[in-house]
A protein has these predicted regions:
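P-loop NTPase catalytic phosphate-binding loop
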Residues: 2-5, 9-139, 158-224, 233, ...
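Small-molecule kinase domains that catalyze NTP-dependent phosphoryl transfer to phosphate-bearing small molecules
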Residues: 245-255
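N-terminal, intrinsically disordered, polar/charged segments of Gram-positive cell-envelope systems
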Residues: 287-289
Length: 301
């Protein structure tokens, strides 16, 4: 779905959304369409829709993957209430890209996890939570998360963001991690439990084909060559992208072809920390209610 905005309001003001709000569902402002009038349209995707509960993000080194994840996290943290989303952050490189987000009350334990034992615990707990929620839905006479919320109940969406997934390939726990990720991918949709996998290497021996199948939203940035592009998105073409920060999203439900878009640029870590601190320093005492805002800056050509 595309959002109509004005050039003067680009990225840094409240937008006219038609009937969409970033505070609802699990919406991600992907960026501008890369076409003759891309300054007029913003592409927003909603992972709360049944068709795209999980996502895969891939690129070469420096291709724009981590920048995109930062923009995604910032928009969720700044637009969604604390009680509406639980963020679990995992990064095989230790989480330096995401340190600025750890003060946000949405982030589980205010940590970004790297240790394999912690990762397995997070994934096991997510699967148990899926089973628990399904029992809760039965008791409430609801078929799924959406119906449960529509009945007036409260429940947070749980989102696991797992960056640098391929770094665990070859470790003693890799098969366990992959098995538990697969379970979440196949059962989490109806329970409001989502997982986003990001990696530079998406060969079939790294990322199981069944996991890929259950991640219909695929966002690919600059790749090294045609085979790298096919590993990430199932299509050639990502190797032709010339600019960092320009991504292609494949398999979006708006058509059967890919959509090329220009991503937003993440603010600096200092700016992110300031925004999060200013909004949530008193969140336990006073509920902060603000209009939705796209957070990010226009990438330079």
């Amino acid at each position: 779905m595309d959002i109509i905005i004005t050039k003067d309001d680009l990225f840094n003001r409240v937008f006219e959304y038609q009937d969409m709000k970033l505070s609802e569902g699990l919406k991600i402002p992907l960026g501008h369409f890369v076409n003759q009038d891309y300054l007029e349209k913003m592409l927003v995707i909603d992972m709360a829709k049944d068709e795209i509960p999980h996502a895969f993000i891939g690129s070469t080194t420096g291709g724009g993957k981590s920048n995109f994840i930062r923009v995604m996290l910032l928009n969720w943290i700044m637009n969604k209430k604390v009680e509406d989303i639980e963020l679990y952050l995992i990064d095989g490189k230790g989480g330096t890209d995401y340190v600025a987000f750890l003060e946000a009350p949405h982030v589980f334990m205010n940590k970004c996890f790297k240790d394999e034992d912690d990762i397995i615990t997070i994934l096991e707990d997510a699967h148990r939570e899926i089973l628990r929620r399904n029992q809760t839905f039965i008791q409430a006479k609801a078929n799924n998360f959406k119906e449960y919320i529509e009945l007036g109940n409260k429940m947070a969406r749980r989102v696991i963001v797992f960056d640098e997934y391929a770094m665990y390939h070859g470790t003693s726990d890799y098969n366990v991690i992959q098995s538990k990720v697969s379970k979440i991918c196949s059962t989490g949709r109806s329970a409001g439990v989502h997982i986003i996998i990001a990696t530079q290497d998406a060969r079939k021996e790294i990322l199981d084909s069944m996991i890929k199948y259950n991640m219909p939203l695929k966002i690919g940035f600059k790749c090294d060559n045609a085979q790298h592009s096919k590993n990430i998105s199932g299509h050639e073409g990502l190797e032709t992208i010339n600019k960092i920060g320009v991504g292609r999203a494949y398999g979006l439900p708006i058509d059967s072809d890919y959509v090329q878009f220009k991503t937003m640029k993440s603010p600096s870590s200092k700016e992110i920390r300031t925004m999060i601190h200013n909004k949530y320093k008193d969140y336990k005492k006073v509920e902060v209610v603000e209009e939705d805002v796209f957070f990010g800056e226009e990438c330079e050509d």
